[in-house]
Amino acid sequence: MAKWSESEALAWYKEQDWIVGCNYLPSNAINQLEMFQPETFDSEINKRELSWANNLGFNSVRVYLHDLLWNDPETFKDILDRFLNICDQNNIRPILVLFDDCHRPFPKLGIQPKPVTGVHNSGWKQSPGMAIVLSLIHI
């Protein structure tokens, strides 16, 4: 595929609907790990909530991915594909975010902490985590 000219890019953009979106994390997940781990990914919750988003006029969601999910690439790709299909069924175009250095620096797979009442993003995890970041400093 060749690079688009400026006029081709502008023509494509003019054909797009106005982007109306939000950050999305399903109601059963405390963070981006819990959203996509096989034990906690919930198609029905995603279908219901993305349907609500569509009914409210949203056409895009920003979704954060976590590098630790790639420890089992086939399972992660399967779950992500299921999520993308749910988005498509609801006319939602996701924006997938690969890196996030906010909040808790020591992520791990498995059961995630319970929410802390009154603390914004109490269970959110950095991606990549501090161990990986520090290991790269000495390269």
What are these model-predicted stretches?
Residues 1-137:
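Active-site mouth of glycoside hydrolases
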